């Protein structure tokens, strides 16, 4: 996380296997191995659809600023309009000037808007642009489930949780969608 790795540019924690090295496309250099992301769930109050839309606009802005502040080279706008590329260049320059910590801290502030104990919903509030609300009651005390050769703690109502994130999670996606979506390569360290 950001407390244990000075150059770590994200607000989520990761379990890293440092026998490997991750080399990222267009992200400032930091030491990372093969990893599993840990997405914390924070209180989300009793949010309405309009509150979710408003929050998602803030998150979208902050995510763009975070990603532009940590990229290692400029890429013109994909909209093929010179003025959009010019605007992106200046906004990216502002993001670089402010630095990733500034925007990561702003994103971190979003999680403190709602008291966890009095919230009906929980959501991952410190990363990504889309707020996915989950009923806090789905988690309860949790349950232990088998995952390969270990037991892990899972939500009490894991079915509702998985459906809200993945829809029909027991059905494989079409073959053409079964591809990696992150921009990095992994290498075994010597």
Please place each PLM-identified region on the residue numbering.
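Short, surface-exposed, charged loop/turn segments at secondary-structure junctions
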Residues: 52-63
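Conserved catalytic core of two-metal-ion nucleotidyltransferases
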Residues: 2-46, 56, 66-78, 83-167, ...
